[in-house]
């Protein structure tokens, strides 16, 4: 009996150290809309991780005071954006970190580079592999990866294109370089699928996306839909096309009378988690997934809006 108590106490006292940060809040990103979405994602997961154990996070100097009183949160202050990679390496070298998760954009290989750093240390990455980010973070490479498995908009290779009016005169045109690609416009319902990807692929929820001329302005999480199972199946087929997707993955979908179109695969945490309520929490599911444990969960969803 005493031996059993000792084992239980030892198990309870094991501290798990989680490195978690969101790039906009760590870099002091100037775009207020990006910061707002970044904070929504960060705050949601931070509270969940802190319910599990101790968290270390990188925060830009202007935001530190907002989190200074959080129990079990260790803050590493960032003064300039170019400090982030070195601070991350230093933490991974000096701290006994068990798990790491970075929320960052795919732009300019930011998420890819930060993930490569995490992968070079003996910690469990709760997110996607750098290999998967390299593909899913590039819209054309994603198209090439999934086009034979699922419906997706016709997409042309990224190269220089000229766009001009059919009946214009005077040589007026717009020139687009290799940073742009041309893709067929698909009209229909803007939806997304939230999944956890590991040894199995678990769809968490089907979500409605609110999109207007300002961009993504909110959503409704865990909706019912007559095609829900079929949409889940198409999202799973797309995810299977890219090796190394792991943890939380978001798949953007458009549904119309012609079928179910896979638009993008997001190899990272998305703003949708703000309205996603799982039991156990998403943070706990990510850790269980990293440890190859069987996942059992219940899902509820909420509507949310982003004031832009």
Swiss-Prot record:
Residue ranges occupied by any ATP-grasp domain in the UniProt entry: 89-291
Residues engaged in binding Mn(2+) 1: 252, 264
Keywords for this protein: ATP-binding, Ligase, Magnesium, Manganese, Metal-binding, Nucleotide-binding
Cofactor: Mg(2+); Mn(2+)
UniProt catalytic activity: tyramine + L-glutamate + ATP = gamma-L-glutamyltyramine + ADP + phosphate + H(+)
The protein's annotated pathway: Cofactor biosynthesis; methanofuran biosynthesis
InterPro entries: ATP-grasp, ATP-grasp_PylC-type, MfnD, MfnD_preATP-grasp, Tyramine-Glutamate_Synthase
Pfam family, one: preATP-grasp_3
Binding site for Mn(2+) 2: 264, 266
Cofactor note: Binds 2 magnesium or manganese ions per subunit.
GO molecular function, one term: metal ion binding
Binding-site positions, Mg(2+) 2: 264, 266
E.C. numbers: 6.3.4.24
Organism domain of life: Archaea
Enzyme class: ligase
Binding of ATP, residues: 115-192
Binding site for Mg(2+) 1: 252, 264
Stated role: Catalyzes the formation of an amide bond between tyramine and the gamma carboxy group of L-glutamate. The enzyme also accepts phenylethylamine in vitro.
Protein name: Tyramine--L-glutamate ligase
Protein species of origin: Methanocaldococcus jannaschii (strain ATCC 43067 / DSM 2661 / JAL-1 / JCM 10045 / NBRC 100440)
Taxonomic path: Archaea, Methanobacteriati, Methanobacteriota, Methanomada group, Methanococci
């Amino acid at each position: 009996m005493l031996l059993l108590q000792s084992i239980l106490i030892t198990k309870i006292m094991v501290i798990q150290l989680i490195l978690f940060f969101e790039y906009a809040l760590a870099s002091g990103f100037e775009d207020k809309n990006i910061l707002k979405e970044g904070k929504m994602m960060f705050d949601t997961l931070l509270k969940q991780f802190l319910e599990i154990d101790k968290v270390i996070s990188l925060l830009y100097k202007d935001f530190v005071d907002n989190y200074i009183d959080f129990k079990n949160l260790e803050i590493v202050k960032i003064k300039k954006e170019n400090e982030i990679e070195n601070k991350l390496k230093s933490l991974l070298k000096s701290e006994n970190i068990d798990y790491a998760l970075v929320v960052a954009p795919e732009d300019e290989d930011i998420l890819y580079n930060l993930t490569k750093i995490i992968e070079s240390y003996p910690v469990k990455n709760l997110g996607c592999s750098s290999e998967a980010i390299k593909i899913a973070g590039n819209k054309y490479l994603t198209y090439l990866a999934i086009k034979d498995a699922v419906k997706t908009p016709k997409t042309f290779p990224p190269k220089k294109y000229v766009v001009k009016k059919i009946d214009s005169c005077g040589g007026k045109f717009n020139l687009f370089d290799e940073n742009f690609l041309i893709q067929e416009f698909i009209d229909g319902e803007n939806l997304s699928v939230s999944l956890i990807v590991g040894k199995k692929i678990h769809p968490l929820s089907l979500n409605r996306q609110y999109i207007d001329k300002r961009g993504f302005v909110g959503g409704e999480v865990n909706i019912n839909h007559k095609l829900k199972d079929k949409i889940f199946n198409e999202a799973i087929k797309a995810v299977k096309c890219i090796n190394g997707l792991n943890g939380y993955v978001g798949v953007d979908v458009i549904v119309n009378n012609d079928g179910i179109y896979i638009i993008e695969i997001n190899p990272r945490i998305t703003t949708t988690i703000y309205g996603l309520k799982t039991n156990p929490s998403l943070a706990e599911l990510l850790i269980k997934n990293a440890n190859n444990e069987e996942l059992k969960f219940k899902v509820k969803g909420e509507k949310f809006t982003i004031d832009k």
